[in-house]
Amino acid sequence: MLCSSHNIYTAFMKLPHTNASWKPKLNVPLLLIRPSPPALRRWVPMATGPSLIPNRPCHHGDKVVVIMGATGSGKSQLSIDLATLFPSEIINSDKMQVYSGLDITTNKIPPEDRLGIPHHLIGSIGPEAGEFTPSDFRALGQSVIEDIISRGNLPFVVGGSNSFIYALLAERFNPGSDVLSGSGKVSHELVFDCCFLWVDLSFPVLDEYLRKRVDDMFNSGMFEELVQYYYDDTNRFQRGNRTGLQKAIGVPEFERCFRRYAPRKSDTWAGLDPVRRAAYQEAVREIKENTCQLAKRQIGKIMRLRDGGWDLRRLNATEAFRAAMAAEGSGKGHRWADIWEAQVLGPSAKIVKRFLEE
């Protein structure tokens, strides 16, 4: 959803609901009351010692919808689609997207694609604030959930950082234990009454899509964004201990290239000289590989949550992605949109509707 060019990334992430004449065919009432969210409270970093952190004074009966999945699996698209059907607000749970800056590199959904739906904790933390930890997300995220519920809206927690999701929702959370990497037992007791939607697809299809998406991101300004990031503070590329936004995929890969071939501030991806382009293409290859490896790790953590007792409802988006990639440049986008609605959006809407009626 990051670019306006007609490529595979835009093709998949922009479903027909962006057309004002399109209406969902689902038998779910449209509720579009959108109160403005309150100003975000000032973030105060929390200690991350080994002590157990109890839950905030939340009500266990409060309902929260959680949309999970690997990077690039369509979580943001599903959240926007569902938010046009239910009175809701979206809480970002991607650990890189909480920071301001590098909007293309971190795949933030741009404001114009949010359709007026309130989004929280996206671009909210200044990168100079340092590391925004799972403990910080637990405290701030639960506060945002309380605010959303107080307005009579449904919180949607959306993102691929499963460590953030676990910290937010587990009844008792130990910041000193990396439960999702195998050390410790997954807590199946939750702070809220949760409905988990897991957007999944076959990994070969996701791998192909992610590699194409990286190309589209560079065609949409990712390189120029990284050059500007470099010139804003060249020292950040020299620091050994990375924190916060410096860990975003794309920054470390280009750091090595920029040390050897410092970019000119006027450089553009399309106008690079052959020497620099050859050097930078190696960084692009690394970005593609690291993105696919991240997706594998995210899927592994989701499966660990499932095996630990979390009731995850899996939505298979494989055929929708296949159709989207096949439709690139063919003008046949309606087919994959129909598949998405039949196999992902429709079942998800029914699950959420039943969840709210329970």
What residues fall within each predicted segment?
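N-terminal phosphate/diphosphate-binding loop that engages ATP/GTP or pyrophosphate donors
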Residues: 48-65, 76-156, 164-182
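Charged, alpha-helix-enriched surfaces in structured cytosolic catalytic cores
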Residues: 132, 136-139, 159, 163, ...
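Residue-level signal for inorganic ion chemistry
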Residues: 94, 122, 160, 221, ...
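Catalytic core of IPPT-family isopentenyl/dimethylallyl transferases
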Residues: 2-87, 192-358
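Phosphate/Mg2+-binding loops and adjacent switch elements
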Residues: 147-224, 228
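Short, conserved catalytic or adaptor-binding loops enriched in Gly and charged residues
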Residues: 111-116, 185-191, 305-307
